[in-house]
Amino acid sequence: MWKLKIAEGDKNSPYISTTNNFVGRQIWEFDPNAGTAEELAEVEEARQNFYKNRHQVKPASDLIFRLQFLREKNFKQTIPQVKVEDGEEITYDTATAAMKRAAHYFSAIQASDGHWPAENSGPMYFLPPFVFCLYITGHLDTVFTAAHRREVLRYLYNHQHEDGGWGIHIEAPSSMFGTVYSYLTMRLLGLGPNDGENNACARARKWIRDNGGVTYIPSWGKNWLSILGLFEWAGTHPMPPEFWMLPSHFPLHPAQMWCFCRLVYMPLCYLYGKRFVGPITPLIKQLREELHTEPYDKINWRKVRHQCAKTDLYYPHPFVQEVLWDTLYFATEPLLTRWPLNKYVREKALKQTMKIIHYEDQSSRYITIGCVEKPLCMLACWVEDPEGVAFKKHLERIADFIWIGEDGMKVQTFGSQTWDTALGLQALLACNIVDEIGPALAKGHDYLKKAQVRDNPVGDYTSNFRHFSKGAWTFSDQDHGWQVSDCTAESLKCCLHFSMLPPEIVGEKHDPERLYEAVNFILSLQDKNGGIAVWEKAGASLMLEWLNPVEFLEDLIVEHTYVECTASAIEAFVMFKKLYPHHRKKEIENFLVKAVQYIENEQTADGSWYGNWGVCFLYGTCFALGGLHAAGKTYNNCLAIRRAVEFLLQAQSDDGGWGESYKSCPSKIYVPLDGKRSTVVHTALAILGLIHAGQAERDPTPIHRGVKLLINSQLENGDFPQQEIMGVFMRNCMLHYAQYRNIFPLWALAEYRRKVPLPN
């Protein structure tokens, strides 16, 4: 039986380190002897229910850890379930009952160290590179046990489409990228070419070959296939490591890139520069025959470089990019790979690149910035020294990425511990029932204090192209180390709330100096347009986006500013200014003026705001309205708010709720769900937005209708149903935030009960 372990790690191991006793760490362990017959039956029932409905509801309900926590805490919902009939008014007591039921359930799924665990996954290309790397290095059997393999295969079977393929994420239609990666994972884990549940391998292979074969995989996939020996490096776009040797202010230096882009390029250019290829095993030779539509030795690699399946093509390469690739391919690379430049330039560039890889690994305790970078950095360390300490330290941190759900084993982005906790705590605080949920609040407060980043990246971080991190909060845990603006703003809001509550209930307030450090970090990220970025300050030319090599994502070359992050910062600063009016007073006031103007400028023609990190216009609009409301804007004095209210009211469905398709994100146009279905998360976001906009004072009817849907959707134990996927990044790839279905409905019910007049 699988069990989630919290804040655990071998403190005596020379291959793993921590900055705060592993607070926030969440790892899964399999114990074949654990679990009663009843517990095992519960888990199996959850798996079977997901399987039966897998084509209707793609994201898992994250029940494996929830069942465990609810058992361990002996949770029983004691507040009777409530429903609102047609024509019936929602009373204060009804709203209170629904809110308390949600709050008690949510408190019960809190971890012992104070954070809220959850799945944060969804893309089908997160897991396979871990399998690829471990296969190449010979560690696949030791890291992924038979229990792991069963869960990986369960995940792939559950998310295989009826046409035999897989999308780039669990809700997307079949793609070459997702299908090739998933097929290779099954085969490397030991399935034969015609094995797998419901002929999984044969159906996947047919999809690949019917769509042109593996040469049509996007450029990112071509890189990993070259590493595996299923492709030739001559069939990929050049990634010269020499760019690291340019002056850092030069437009093509990686320092100008968005941090995730930079840190993918970093190990990839090392592997490319060495033309590294893993062992050509009999299985690799067989896979060459299975995946290509012509004999491997007959393929014209030069011609396949620019090929990409139509199913995967979201961002076509501009002409200027094709010219750059061809220049590097035909002119630059032939020079850099021949004597004397291969010895005096290429070797020096590779050493410089490896030095930066080691720096980033050490700064993140070998977690790295994310799951895409992790296996690449791990492999680069193995290529440098298969018996080296760096590679062994990487192996110890694989567990930090693994997540087990009723749909199987997947790989996380890197965990959303702090983000979910900061939002969840605000939802609980809004309930205004401190006496009932004091222990959950105190543990959450303690977690946030321990999760704040206390130091900057190690050594001379500016020479390694890093922004300062002291005072920030990460998306995941402190060991991860990567500062995030909105996680910092939302965590700061929590700490400020807690400072106004009785310390005997919620714990001592956070050290003001630590709060000042958080403010300093947020201030450092404001761009000249008034918005703030996520990880590092924006500023590189947006024209560099023309060089985006990833055909299925957009806006990933340079850092951008974001409405949601800016709105969170406004809310945090308005609250901070009231409690600490003297710290950087003038700078905060100037920040707020520019930030509000930025949000107003970013509003779309229909009155909404595009959500960059959530689906989509309902998500962005909720955050934007929260920021404007905090800054003192109202329906009467702000045209942007009036236009936003009009958008929200027009988007309301006949059932009283709201529901938006993930397709809004890539299309950049509001797309309702088929049949104008509603979801509890979108409904909650819209309710929060309308409350921010003062709709309760004008006409609360739309809010009442939305809350009725929330109350009637609540499950018997206080949970809410899992529905559509709710997160996104880079326009076209979705992320599953499993806690959103609890956080936002709870928050909406709490704000409704506090701010909307209700009959007793």
Swiss-Prot record:
Keywords: Isomerase, Repeat. Its EC number is 5.4.99.56. PFTB repeats lie at residues 99-141, 149-190, 441-485, 515-560, 592-632, 641-689, 703-744. The active site is at D486 (proton donor). GO terms for molecular function: beta-amyrin synthase activity. Pathway: Secondary metabolite biosynthesis; terpenoid biosynthesis. It comes from the Eukaryota. One of its GO terms (cellular component) is lipid droplet. GO terms for biological process: triterpenoid biosynthetic process. CDD domains: SQCY_1 (cd02892). Transmembrane segments: none annotated. Mainly expressed in fruits. Disulfide bonds: none annotated. Pfam families: SQHop_cyclase_C, SQHop_cyclase_N. It catalyses: (S)-2,3-epoxysqualene = tirucalla-7,24-dien-3beta-ol. Belongs to the terpene cyclase/mutase family. PANTHER family: BETA-AMYRIN SYNTHASE-RELATED, TERPENE CYCLASE/MUTASE FAMILY MEMBER. Oxidosqualene cyclase involved in the biosynthesis of limonoids triterpene natural products such as azadirachtin, an antifeedant widely used as bioinsecticide, and possessing many medicinal applications including anti-tumoral, anti-malarial, anti-rheumatic, antibacterial, anti-inflammatory, anti-pyretic and diuretic effects. Converts 2,3-oxidosqualene (2,3-epoxysqualene) into tirucalladienol, generating rings and asymmetric centers in a single transformation. This is Tirucalladienol synthase OSC1. The lineage of its organism: Eukaryota, Viridiplantae, Streptophyta, Embryophyta, Tracheophyta.
